[in-house]
């Protein structure tokens, strides 16, 4: 399968092309010098041709299968965004609201960060993490195309460890279910007992003789 077309002019580097694909707005530009540093590639499996394509300054995406290039760039991206320079780049995107806001009403449009549910490629797509309610949500469809491993499971927490001044306060308000203004009892919100669940069998202490008596021989 050939690479999807960019929303921008196709002439340019592979990274320009990748970042220009609609739905890739969460991703960050990894500098060429970071990719060229072999230390940053330690432990990643790839061939030299894949790396050359990622670093190609004049990439032509016609009839080109980009699966391996996307994976390599994605795994490098996950490492870069937890580096000091990468965190600063992501901070700018966070403060601009590039990642969207929490869908929870009482978080009052708190800005969110991208997060992965796995650190392994091709397990799940990217999700969004709200630092206010400390929950994870599915992003809008056009923002959920990237692999979650591009961000990893640790990124939001590393981000706020480095930038503690950006940690928001937890939400004060909480939704309270009501009917005609009256608050519901907790039991009213619990699911009914399953009809299929077997009844609890209670053995009568009267119907059975104690074990010591049953073992007495008859005379």
UniProtKB/Swiss-Prot annotation:
Spans annotated as Disordered: 194-219
User: In which domain of life is the source organism classified?
Assistant: Eukaryota
Q: From the UniProt record, which GO molecular function terms apply?
A: protein kinase regulator activity
Q: Where are the transmembrane segments?
A: none
GO CC field: cytoplasm; protein kinase CK2 complex
- Bias (Polar residues) occurs at 204-219
Q: Name one Pfam family in it.
A: CK_II_beta
Family, as annotated = Belongs to the casein kinase 2 subunit beta family.
Name-wise, this protein is: Suppressor-of-stellate-like protein
**Which species is listed as the source?**
Drosophila melanogaster (Fruit fly)
